[in-house]
Design a protein with these regions (language model features):
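Helix-breaking motifs and short loop linkers at transmembrane-helix boundaries and internal kinks
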Residues: 37, 69, 90-96, 289-290
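C-terminal transmembrane helical hairpin of 12-TM major facilitator-type secondary transporters
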Residues: 269-314
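Conserved MFS/SLC helix-loop-helix module at the cytosolic interface between two early adjacent transmembrane helices
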Residues: 56-92
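Cytoplasmic helix-loop-helix junction between adjacent transmembrane helices
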Residues: 100-138
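Paired small-residue
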Residues: 84, 95-103, 294-302
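A late C-terminal transmembrane helix in Major Facilitator Superfamily
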Residues: 320-356, 364
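Helix-to-loop junctions at the C-terminal end of transmembrane segments
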Residues: 57-69, 255-267, 352
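Helix-loop-helix hairpin linking two adjacent transmembrane segments in secondary transporters
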Residues: 96, 125-127, 133-179, 225, ...
Length: 383
């Protein structure tokens, strides 16, 4: 991929669509609750079940289908996501919705892992960072425009209609992949459990996985509560909150884009160190300037940009350490992202109950310092 071609554009569009299927309920939980006659807290379980499917179901799925050629498996998982979306639209009660969301978390995130490994396989090594950044750009755009747009559309469309639109886009992408996606080298990409387990004995890989878990614990500890954090400290900011959320979305988009170029220029390991330092510095500034409304907003934007700058390095690192021969390790990395998020948000909830929402800064600051330590050890031991 010497330049973003049609294949990469379709992958990026699918990244947008699948991010929307994951996040869409977050923007309209209140409306979903009304339509299903349940509480907002209960409707939040639709996201929780999706995360559990992603965390635990993806590695198991890749093991069960390890003999299927990668591009065929990718199409199967996309087709399964289309079917689960139809099931979601026609579900008759809340329990059915929860089951379908669990299955959707498995199929959509299995597709995501296979998409990443396919993109990296199709890209020269010196452009893998930029290709991956272009792919992830789809999910960051979902945060910038997709979720706010969904909220606006919910005034005239119910949530099922929104999923009809997303499913139509998935169907078009599947048709394109069926016609144009090249087959992968089956011998190079099939899952060999004995060889896969060897990666768990590799210190460099384990440190990468530890970095992933730690980073997303800190990320979700703060980001999950970023909106109530700002509103509680600065109630006067509420009329501008939608604009601030757009700013946060743009920060994620920009950080991801810069991260791809920097990764190709200096390598993923140095980029991970740079990202950890930037996250730590941003958190320190958020803490120091906590009484200042606009400086708090500014440094939260800087922190989010540095987090998204770092995020794509993790998949690039796993791919390069395993010579892009392990979709299974990419799925483990994805599972740790989901688990880290769940642990971080839960830890933040405990901290908020014990000492107030302003204290969540300390959770993310500590995890950022831990990232620096992990990466120092990794770069010294495995130069």
């Amino acid at each position: 991929m010497k330049k973003p071609n049609m294949m990469l554009l379709v992958f990026s569009a699918m990244s947008f669509v699948l991010a929307m299927t994951a996040f869409v309920f977050s923007g309209i939980l209140d409306k979903v609750a009304v339509s299903l006659d349940i509480s907002v807290a209960q409707s939040g379980l639709l996201n929780t079940m999706y995360s559990y499917g992603a965390a635990f179901g993806v590695p198991i799925t890749l093991i069960l289908f390890r003999k299927v050629e990668r591009s065929k498996m990718l199409k199967l998982m996309l087709f399964a996501t289309i079917l689960t979306t139809f099931a979601l639209i026609y579900a008759q009660n809340f329990v059915q919705l929860l089951i379908v969301r669990l299955l959707m978390g498995i199929s959509a995130n299995s597709y995501g892992v296979l998409a990443i490994s396919t993109i990296l396989a199709l890209s020269p090594k010196d452009r893998q960072g930029r290709s991956l950044a272009f792919y992830i750009m789809g999910s960051s755009l979902a945060l910038v425009i997709g979720i706010p747009l969904t909220r606006a559309l919910s005034a005239v469309l119910d949530w099922r209609s929104i999923f009809w639109i997303l499913n139509a886009m998935m169907l078009l992408s599947l048709v394109y992949f069926l016609k144009y996606l090249p087959k992968a080298d089956h011998e190079a990409t099939k899952l060999d459990l004995k060889n896969e387990l060897q990666f768990f004995k590799d210190g460099k890989t384990l440190l990468l996985l530890a970095y992933t878990l730690t980073m997303f614990m800190g990320y979700h500890a703060f980001y999950t509560y970023a909106t109530p954090y700002l509103l509680l400290l600065f109630p006067s900011i509420e009329p501008l909150m939608s604009l601030i959320l757009v700013g946060l979305g743009l920060a994620s988009f920009t950080g991801n884009l810069i991260g791809g170029h920097v990764s190709d220029a200096i390598g993923y390991a140095k980029s991970m160190m740079l990202g950890a330092v930037l996250q730590t510095a941003a958190m320190l500034l958020i803490l120091v300037f906590q009484p200042s409304k606009w400086l708090s907003v500014l440094f939260i934007i800087v922190w989010l940009m540095s987090a998204w700058f770092t995020g794509l390095q993790l998949n690039t690192g796993i791919a390069q350490v395993t010579d892009n021969k392990s979709s299974f390790m990419l799925s483990i990395n994805g599972s740790l992202i989901q688990l880290g998020g769940a642990f971080g948000a839960s830890l933040a909830a405990v901290v908020i109950n014990l000492s107030g929402i302003q204290s969540i800064v300390f959770v993310t600051l500590l995890t950022s310092l831990a990232l620096i330590l992990i990466q120092v050890v990794s770069m010294r031991k495995y130069p």
